[in-house]
């Protein structure tokens, strides 16, 4: 059983420290002939950190080495780039994070859905993997588009890659246009507050932000699908945040993790944590009256019910997971 947010922070940080110490030792001493000191943790001994990191670096390094097809939709998604990235996404989902996904069989495949999940860090690995999981389960449907924070989509080095893989700037207008044209959407209503959670606050959902995306679902009668994602928050565990240097480069905060900036660019790679994704029963919206959008009390109730369901799914996933590493 995963220790989760309700147990000893000291014990959880000690496991994280052991794992990262083992990871740093293997990376820095790849060419050394000295015998390695084993970490006394079964799940760490079974996982080959060095091989996983080397393969991940190779796969990330091969991205973008293909000409664009020119067949790009209005939001920038490129089928050629997406096809080229599927092997990497399969590797991340099946081998690197060993993601267990449940509940997708209850999803309506006949119309667009709004998937609403807990936010898991600055980089949108959660949206990428959830989108990939839904597409694999429903291969005849369009790939869901995942909403990305505005500040991240404005970074010149990030925006093209995210857009090519289905990332869309998070705003009500984009969500409405996608749902109206039959595309499912993945949203993270915690916003920056959720992305900025430090390690001690992991898996405790923050208050949802403005309800623009959920209003778009109401307008389009798209079911709200709660999703709990566990594993992504430990992939880049934030120990603390530095605000001053972040503002200088246009970021909401600069995360300090056990590997970044200590390992330099290598520290930007995510850790091979164990992921569990639980998709809950959709919340249908067809029965809500025409005036639901103007009823703030009703809307607040729907949003709070959605948040509670996501927190329950996260807690269930933590109960199921043996540890952050598998």
Language-model features: locations:
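Intrinsically disordered, low-complexity mixed-charge segments
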Residues: 1
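Membrane-anchoring hydrophobic helices of lipid-metabolizing enzymes
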Residues: 4-134, 138-173, 242, 315-326
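Soluble catalytic domains of membrane acyltransferases
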Residues: 94-294
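C-terminal terminal-subdomain/extension
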Residues: 270-326
